[in-house]
C-alpha cells in the first residue's frame, strides 16, 4: 500500500516532466484505436447491398498491428529517457537503503500508471478520430457520412492489450538494467563526456559500406553497358549508360585514394568529394525509369529493382554526409573568427551544440532518413490510391464484362467463337434485369499480324463502327461517323497527347486485308470504354467501317453487360466463380485462349478494400514514423537540458537576462530541430518531385492536379501541426527544467 501511494505521488510530481511521454503515447493510442476500429466485429456502416465491408477487416487489422510494432521502439526509447532522467534520484534512494529491485519495480509502476492514463485518454480521443476514418471509408464507397457515436469493446481490448504488453516487455528490461547498475554509475551518468565529432566512427563506417555499394554499382553498370549498349541509342540513353559506369568508377577511385591519403586530405574534404560523387552517381540512376518509359530499353524487373536499391543507397549516403558536414561546418564557422565566437553569449551556444555533436549527428541522420521516408509515404499514399481508384473507373466500366485473348493461341483454328451463353443462363436464373447487352468481335487489320508475338510490338486491334457506336451508346457517348474508306482511333485515357500526335502523324494510312484506309478528319477519341478492348501492350484501337471488318480475321470476342441495378455482392460473387470455371484466365492446355473477366461489384469491392488498407496503412505508418522522429528529437533535447541546466544557472549568476536565455534556448532547439527537418523536407521534395514527374500522365488521367494539391495541403497541415506541438512542448519543458534547477541552486 505504501509503495502504491509512492507510485501515485511520483507520477503526480513528475507529470510535467513526462508531458512528452504522455502526449506521444496518447497520440499513438488515438491513432491505433481509430484506424483499428473499422476492423471491429461490431462495426456496421451503412453501405449498399453491393458492398461487403468484411473484405478489408482482416487485412486492416494485420496491417495496423504490424506497423504498430514500431511503437515498441518508441516506448523503449521514451522509457530509457525517463530512466536516464531519474538516475540521480534512483542513486539517492539506493544510498538510503532501498533495494534496487524495489526501485525498478516502483519505476515500472510509475510508467505503467502513466501508460494506463495515456491509453484511457487515447481511446476517448480515438472514438472521435475514428469518425474521420469512417468518413474516409464511406467516401471510398461513394456513400454519404453521418456522425454516429460508437464504442467497440473488441477494439478497446486489443488496444489496451497491445500497449500493456509493450510496456511490460520494456518495463522488465528497465528493471533488469536497474538491478545490474551500480550506485556510482547512477550518480555519475550525467557527468560523462562523449567523444568529439572527428573521433566518431559513425561516418567512416557509412563510407565503407557506400564504397562496397559503389563497387557493386560499377560492376552492374559495366555489365549492362556490355550487353545493352547500342551506338544507335539516342543521346540521353548513351549518357545514362556512360554515367552508370563513369561516375561510380570516379567516386570509387576517390574513396580509395582518400582512404590512403586521409591524413593529408582530411576527413571533411574527403567526405565532400564522396558527396559530390554520390550526387553525380544518382543522376543517371534516377534517369533510368524515365528513359525506360520513353524508349523501351528492355530492362527486366530485377534490373530496375537493382537500380532502385542503388538510388536508395545514394540518398541515404547523401543525407548522412550532409548531416555530418553541416555539423563539421558549425565547428569550422565557430573557429574561423574569434570575434564571432565571443560575441555576446555565442561561446555558450557553441559549447552547448558541440558538447553532444557526435551523438546528435548520428541521431539527426537517422531522424532525417526516417522523416524523409515518412513525408514520402504521406504524399505517395494519395497518389497510389487515387491512381488505383481512377484506374478502377476505366477498368470496371460495365457491370459484367468478358473478353478472350488470342495472344497464347498459335493456330487460327483454335481461336474462340462464343457468345458466352453461361452468362445468359445465369442472368435468366437469377432474374437480373438487363439495361444493355452487347456481344462483338475485334479484328486484326492484316491476318499476317496474327503471328506477331514480340512482347512490346503486338499490333493494335480493330473494331467495327457499329460495335464501337454500340459501346459508346452503352456509356452515354454520342456516336461517330466514318466514310467507307476512312478509319479513326480510340486511345487509352492514360495515353499522353504527345504520343498520340506522334502516332497519328506516322499512321495516316491503315493497310488492311480489305484495302487501304485513310485517317478521318476527326480521328482521335479518348473516353473511358474499358481496358479489355486493347491488345496487350497497346494503347490504341482502330475504328473501321463495318464492310471492312467483315473481311478481316476476328481474334477477340467480347461481351459487355449493363444491369438495371447494381448486382448484390453474393450474386456477383457466384457469377465471378462461374466465369472463372467456364472461362479460365490461364487454361491448363497450351494453344488455347485465355479470358479476362470482370464483375463490377466484386471488382469494386476488392479494389476499394485493398486501396483503403493501403492508404490507411501508409498514412498511419507515416504519422507513426513522424511522431517517433519528433518525440526522439524532443526527448534528446530535454535530456540535454537536464544534464546542462547547471550551465544556465551559472549564466544567471553572471547577470545574463532571462530574455537572452530564452533566445539561447530557441537557437539551440532551432538547430537540432531545424537541421534534420529541413534536410528531410528538401530530400523528400526532390524524391517526390521525381516520382510525380514519372507518373504525371497517370495523375492527369486518374487523379487530377487539383485533387492532388488539396491532399498535399492536408499533409503539410498535419506535419506543421505535429511539429509545432512537439517544438512548443519541448521549449516549455526545456524552460521549466533550467528554471527549476536555478531555483534549487539558490
Label every model-predicted segment.
Residues 6-17, 73-113, 190-197, 631-670:
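Interfacial "coupling" helices/loops that link adjacent transmembrane helices in transporter permeases
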Residues 1-30, 197-204, 208, 265-266, ...:
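N-terminal Sec/SRP start-transfer signal
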Residues 30-41, 77-81, 113-143, 155-180, ...:
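Small-residue-rich transmembrane alpha-helices
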Residues 30-62, 136, 372-398, 611, ...:
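Alpha-helical transmembrane segments
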Residues 392-612:
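Nucleotide-cofactor and metal-assisted catalytic machinery
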Residues 52-69, 141-169, 196-209, 235-249, ...:
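Conserved transmembrane alpha-helices of multi-pass membrane proteins
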Residues 16-23, 34-66, 82-84, 233-250, ...:
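Peri-transmembrane interface segments
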Residues 1-5, 181-197, 643, 736-746:
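Short cytosolic juxtamembrane segments of multi-pass membrane proteins
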Amino acid at each position: 500500500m505504501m509503495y502504491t501511494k509512492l507510485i501515485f505521488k511520483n507520477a503526480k510530481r513528475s507529470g510535467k516532466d513526462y508531458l512528452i511521454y504522455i502526449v506521444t503515447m496518447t497520440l499513438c493510442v488515438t491513432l491505433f484505436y481509430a484506424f483499428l476500429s473499422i476492423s471491429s466485429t461490431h462495426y456496421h456502416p451503412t453501405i449498399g447491398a453491393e458492398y461487403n465491408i468484411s473484405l478489408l477487416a482482416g487485412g486492416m487489422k494485420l496491417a495496423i498491428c504490424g506497423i504498430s510494432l514500431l511503437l515498441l521502439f518508441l516506448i523503449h526509447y521514451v522509457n530509457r529517457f525517463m530512466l536516464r532522467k531519474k538516475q540521480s534520484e534512483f542513486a539517492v534512494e539506493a544510498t538510503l537503503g532501498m533495494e534496487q529491485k524495489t526501485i525498478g519495480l516502483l519505476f515500472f509502476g510509475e510508467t505503467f500508471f502513466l501508460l494506463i492514463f495515456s491509453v484511457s485518454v487515447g481511446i476517448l480521443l480515438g472514438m472521435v478520430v475514428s469518425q474521420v476514418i469512417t468518413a474516409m471509408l464511406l467516401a471510398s464507397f461513394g456513400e454519404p457520412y453521418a456522425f454516429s457515436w460508437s464504442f467497440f469493446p473488441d477494439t478497446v481490448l486489443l488496444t489496451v492489450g497491445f500497449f500493456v504488453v509493450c510496456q511490460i516487455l520494456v518495463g522488465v528490461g528497465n528493471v533488469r538494467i536497474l538491478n545490474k547498475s551500480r550506485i556510482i554509475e547512477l550518480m555519475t551518468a550525467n557527468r560523462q563526456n562523449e567523444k568529439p565529432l572527428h573521433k566518431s566512427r559513425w561516418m567512416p563506417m557509412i563510407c565503407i559500406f557506400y564504397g562496397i555499394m559503389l563497387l557493386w554499382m560499377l560492376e552492374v553498370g559495366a555489365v549492362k553497358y556490355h550487353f545493352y549498349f547500342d551506338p544507335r541509342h539516342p543521346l540521353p540513353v548513351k549518357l545514362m549508360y556512360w554515367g552508370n559506369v563513369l561516375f561510380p568508377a570516379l567516386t570509387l577511385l576517390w574513396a580509395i585514394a582518400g582512404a590512403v591519403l586521409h591524413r593529408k586530405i582530411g576527413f571533411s574534404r574527403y567526405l565532400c568529394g564522396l558527396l559530390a560523387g554520390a550526387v553525380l552517381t544518382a543522376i543517371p540512376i534516377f534517369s533510368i525509369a524515365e528513359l525506360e518509359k520513353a524508349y523501351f530499353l528492355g530492362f527486366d524487373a530485377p534490373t530496375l529493382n537493382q537500380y532502385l536499391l542503388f538510388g536508395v543507397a545514394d540518398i541515404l549516403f547523401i543525407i548522412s554526409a550532409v548531416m555530418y558536414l553541416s555539423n563539421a561546418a558549425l565547428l569550422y564557422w565557430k573557429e574561423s573568427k574569434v570575434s564571432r565566437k565571443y560575441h555576446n553569449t555565442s561561446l555558450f551556444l557553441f559549447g552547448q551544440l558541440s558538447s553532444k555533436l557526435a551523438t546528435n549527428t548520428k541521431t539527426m541522420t537517422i531522424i532525417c532518413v526516417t522523416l524523409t521516408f515518412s513525408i514520402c509515404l504521406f504524399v505517395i499514399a494519395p497518389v497510389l490510391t487515387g491512381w488505383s481508384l481512377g484506374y478502377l473507373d476505366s477498368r470496371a466500366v460495365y457491370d459484367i464484362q468478358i473478353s478472350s485473348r488470342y495472344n497464347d493461341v498459335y493456330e487460327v483454328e483454335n481461336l474462340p467463337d462464343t457468345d458466352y451463353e453461361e452468362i445468359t443462363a445465369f442472368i435468366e436464373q437469377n432474374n437480373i434485369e438487363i439495361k444493355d447487352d452487347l456481344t462483338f468481335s475485334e479484328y486484326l487489320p492484316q491476318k499476317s499480324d496474327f503471328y506477331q508475338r514480340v512482347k512490346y510490338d503486338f499490333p493494335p486491334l480493330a473494331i467495327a463502327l457499329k460495335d464501337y457506336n454500340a459501346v459508346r451508346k452503352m456509356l452515354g457517348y454520342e456516336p461517330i461517323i466514318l466514310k467507307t474508306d476512312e478509319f479513326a482511333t480510340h486511345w487509352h485515357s492514360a495515353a499522353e497527347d504527345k504520343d498520340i500526335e506522334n502516332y497519328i502523324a506516322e499512321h495516316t494510312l491503315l493497310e488492311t486485308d480489305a484495302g487501304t484506309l485513310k485517317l478521318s478528319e476527326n480521328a482521335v477519341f479518348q473516353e473511358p470504354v474499358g481496358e479489355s478492348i486493347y491488345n496487350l501492350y497497346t494503347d490504341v484501337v482502330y475504328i473501321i467501317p463495318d464492310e471492312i471488318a467483315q473481311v478481316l480475321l476476328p481474334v477477340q470476342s467480347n461481351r459487355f453487360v449493363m444491369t438495371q441495378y447494381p448486382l448484390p455482392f453474393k450474386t456477383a460473387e457466384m457469377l465471378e466463380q462461374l466465369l472463372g470455371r467456364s472461362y479460365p484466365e490461364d487454361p491448363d492446355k497450351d494453344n488455347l485462349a485465355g479470358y479476362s473477366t470482370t464483375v463490377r461489384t466484386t471488382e469494386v469491392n476488392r479494389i476499394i478494400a485493398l486501396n483503403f488498407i493501403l492508404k490507411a496503412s501508409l498514412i498511419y505508418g507515416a504519422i507513426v514514423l513522424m511522431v517517433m522522429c519528433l518525440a526522439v528529437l524532443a526527448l534528446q533535447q530535454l535530456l540535454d537540458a537536464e544534464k546542462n541546466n547547471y550551465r544556465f544557472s551559472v549564466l544567471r549568476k553572471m547577470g545574463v537576462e532571462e530574455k537572452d536565455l530564452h533566445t539561447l534556448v530557441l537557437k539551440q532547439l532551432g538547430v537540432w530541430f531545424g537541421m534534420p527537418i529541413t534536410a528531410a523536407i528538401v530530400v523528400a521534395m526532390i524524391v517526390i518531385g521525381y516520382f510525380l514527374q514519372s507518373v504525371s500522365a497517370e495523375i492527369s488521367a486518374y487523379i487530377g492536379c487539383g485533387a492532388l494539391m488539396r491532399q498535399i495541403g492536408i499533409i503539410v497541415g498535419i506535419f506543421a501541426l505535429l511539429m509545432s506541438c512537439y517544438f512548443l512542448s519541448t521549449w516549455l519543458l526545456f524552460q521549466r527544467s533550467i528554471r527549476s534547477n536555478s531555483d534549487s541552486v539558490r
